[in-house]
Amino acid sequence: MSLGFGLGLQYSKLSDGGGFEGFLNQFPGASLGLSLRLLDRNYTGFCIKVRRSSDNNELDIGFLNNELDIVSLLNFVGSGDGKVIIWYDQSGNGNNATQITASKQPTIVGNGSLILDNGKPAILFPTNLLGNMSFNSVNQTTLLSVASILSFTQVNYVLWSESAAKGFFYGGRLRGVNGLGISDGSIKSITEENLESKIAYFNYNGTNYDVAENGNSVTALPNGSNFPSDSVGRPNISEVEFDGKMQEIILYPSEQSANKVAMENNINNRYNIY
């Protein structure tokens, strides 16, 4: 059952008349923009659709002061859990990430408390649910994401392609993985692995994937190949599901290496990771 519109949308535009510029205003052309902050001053939609555990009612939650409307979210969920059914795409392309199976939905509120990572709202993808959030297949050349993993016991795929059986991961001490990397027929990763929140940068340069975390210089993962994505997290296989927290995923169909530093600075100014 859906309760319709959330209160957050009423307030989202009141705060951006004083010069607010979202990430997608500064860096236009994204094919996918999922975030718990407002990415575009012209976006008038919602942030997430949430199901509360107490009675399974659903509500769209918008933005307050250009951030997720936490007040409306917590008032709606109450003392139970809030599960994310839809993570709305702010790019204007309608590529909303969705999980309709209740048992596989990630969590934004647990026992009445907001899920946080580094002090900011986050969506928790706990292990053993074999869950993901699917969206329309999107071609990407550059990927930026903000996430953290909770365990090294599986390959933590933050983004996956069901059609191509390829993806991007945040680490996990399994199958030779040592940090951020890609699987495109073979597994390749950089060697900077920990459980801390990371800003990840993946960029396909036509030959290799250039990969970096937290504003560092890129490492080229050799013999890479470009591929589309259609899933936040990887479904159905426990040793490769994402076990962690996500806050932002932004994809571009065109190469964005010239904007790397400015993009990472914008994201870090919000999340204060490094």
Residue ranges and their predicted role:
Residues 1-2, 6-16:
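Intrinsically disordered, compositionally biased repeat/linker segments
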Residues 12-46, 51-52:
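N-terminal module-boundary/linker segments of secreted carbohydrate-active enzymes
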Residues 13, 50-62, 127-134, 164-170, ...:
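Short, surface-exposed beta-strand/loop "edge" segments at domain boundaries and coil↔beta transitions
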Residues 37-39, 77-80, 85-128, 137, ...:
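Extracellular glycan-interaction surfaces
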Residues 42-54, 123, 157-160, 229-231:
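Short, hydrophobic/proline-enriched secondary-structure or compact coil segments at domain edges
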Residues 3-6, 42, 47-55, 63-65, ...:
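Extracellular, beta-strand-rich glycan-interacting domains
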Residues 181-183, 187-188, 225-251:
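Extracellular glycan-interaction patches encoded by glycine-rich segments
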Residues 61-85:
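Aromatic- and Gly/Pro-rich amphipathic surface segment
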